[in-house]
Amino acid sequence: TVQFNLIEGGFKGPVMPINPNQQSVSGVLAYRDIASLPVTPELAILTTSLDEAPALIQELGARGTRAVLLLSRDVLQDHRGARVALLSPDLSQKHADDGESLKQKILEAAKPYLLRIMGPDHLGYAVPSTHLNASLSCTRPLAGHIALLCQSAAVMRSVIDWATRRDIGFSHVISVGMRWDVDFGDLIDYLLRDSNTRAILMYMENTHNRRKFVSAARAAGRVKPVIVLKPRDFRAGPIEDAVYDAVFQRAGILRVNNIEQLFSTAETLATAKPVYSNRLTLLSNSYSLALLTSDTLLRHGGRLAEISEATRAQLARDCRPDYPIENPVDLGDMAGPEEYGKALDLLLQEPGTDGVFVIHAPASVDRSMDSARVVLERAKNQRLIMSCWIGEAAVEPARDLFRAAHIPTYEAPGEAVEAFMRLAQYRRNQELLIETPPSIPEGFTPDIETARRIIQIALTAGRHRLNAYEASQVLSAYEVRTVPLQFASTPEAASEIALELREPVALKILSPDIANKSEVGGVAFGLNNPLEVLVAATGMLERVSELVPNAVIDGFAVQSMQSRHNAYELMIGVRTGRRFGPVIFFGQGGTEAEVIDDVAYAL
């Protein structure tokens, strides 16, 4: 299949199949072995079993080859979900170990020659502009300016077929496979420097080298759009997916939810003028359609742009006398090219809008092509213009007119709104790319030794979580203001602290075995005197002994009550993700935090 694709694709370079048992392969002269090749191949494609690969890679590297595609498919998943080489019929831990050992042998064979390896378990890749199709795909991708990186062979085939039917072309189509060597970070870094690539699309399920990936994506995001379609891994839990969202935002990557959005976003970013906020002006010959579109815009977090009083008055005089003009701007079903032209001339000068979305519905007098030409003339303006000519055969020529001029056009208003909001999000991601943390204030001298000592004591005790008292001390060491907290080892000691404070207090039990104190009745607020504190602390010990009998009790935390009207209870902390390590989280705190789940993550 690979050789057929290479020849049928029109590749002009030499194709040298190696087969010791045949004189030719698909009509092309075959060679017995690597040593028999008349010239050194720049790219070698191995379709042999993986256990033969190390020796072949070493021979190719010694000869001067610098890239190898491992198209071997003798890989499966072991019981842990990790892909391994299948070296015998039954799949067991031994074969998983053999697979990892084989991977290391392949990488060690390539290392002395700086030879890079793609795969295994992938479809190969194609560069349509050079007629190179070194893939197992049965559909030849068209040439274009969009690069596609795909972790799934099935998704890659589907995307190529989907794009071909819509006349969408690619600069590169790359199946990444198991990424034993070349991974997403390497490929993004390469495509960043490719002048024929205007946008990078990715289907990814996970990434191995997080630092390389984020670094490459941030560099590419400054130059060209990087758009990712990543399914949510429900086995990993919602936190892991939220961390990926934070990574994508920090790297300037735009995340979409399906294949249609993947391409529509790429097309929009490649053809649309930039926006700087989420303010959109709607212009239509149908108030009902404009109203429905405004609902969609607001639901997606967009805003209707403010139109100045002077512009609204001029619109009323020029387009619809004696009719109140607001945003959405309704021109009426009799509007034609003259009304569209006057309205656009005024609206595109408004400083409070980021773009104008023109929605045209079929009317009793069909002037859709004339109106489309007027819109097309105004599209030379520096502001964004988007169009939606609703209908099928009657309006298709108008859509073709917009497409030929690279004006964003859509079949349904909702698609356009989603595209506009992704433009706004892309702009926001670009701003995040250049954000840097503020400098440390002058005169700030944290007590690092105290913080380290507290943490070391906890680690020595085999704990991975600080109690409230220790956390308060660490925060104080870094000059973070907190409500003063005092430690009490017994209920009687807690009562004595309350006597000294002479004001209502809050009481919390301290235990490394109790993460959520409220679930075991380990928190009491508004205790007015020492007796109430004594009774509450004693009751906490009794409840904990029943609910968590093996829990180690360190003592109690006593704090003055802080009551503020309409105050928010928040939480902030650090969690460790499976792939991206420590991440900061911030959100709603309190007893209902897990139920409400209003949390944001950031690197």
Residue ranges, per PLM feature:
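Catalytic-core regions of core metabolic enzymes
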Residues: 1-603
